[in-house]
């Protein structure tokens, strides 16, 4: 049976960039584990062509690498499927900046919160955060401590099928990652 690995994140680089470790025994062990996986699989599929360099630094895997980009499901391309009324009551009135993703370390919520603070006096600018993750409680706490409750709204997690119904209410969609070279390879 042939086996293929579809690489969505580069390890251990992504773990390091998220602030979990930069070197040491665990980092070296992760590197060896990743090298072992790359050696054992028949093919390595990458979602970003920029991933090749990192993978090739771990060994001679050029013959195994294939580029297979991420795609969007049809529900994101068929406007007739959108129900504008579905989430209307949850979305505040105003200019909506929407973030819909993992609420984690790599997403750089410190910068998002700084931006929300800078726009706090503009009451018509609303920051809507859709998702869940390790930093959700931190973000909720910061929204309260920084007195951002009138402009920052955390809606929680929703299934993929609901995303177009949420996105239709956004004036701007926000994509945020820490300023680390490894993360620039995925966008």
Residue ranges and their predicted role:
Residues 107, 159-187:
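Nucleotide-sugar-dependent
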Residues 1-15:
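Active-site proximal beta-strand in glycosyltransferases
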Residues 56, 67, 71-87, 108:
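Acidic anion/phosphate-binding donor-loop and adjacent secondary structure
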Residues 50-52, 135:
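Alpha-helix capping/helix-boundary segments
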Residues 72, 86-107, 112-117, 128:
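Conserved donor-binding/catalytic core segment of Leloir-type glycosyltransferases
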Residues 24-44:
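Membrane-proximal helix-turn-helix segments that form the acceptor-binding/catalytic region
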Residues 128-131, 137-164:
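Nucleotide-activated donor-binding/catalytic signature segment of Leloir-type glycosyltransferases, i.e.
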Residues 50, 68-71, 157:
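Carbohydrate-associated surface elements
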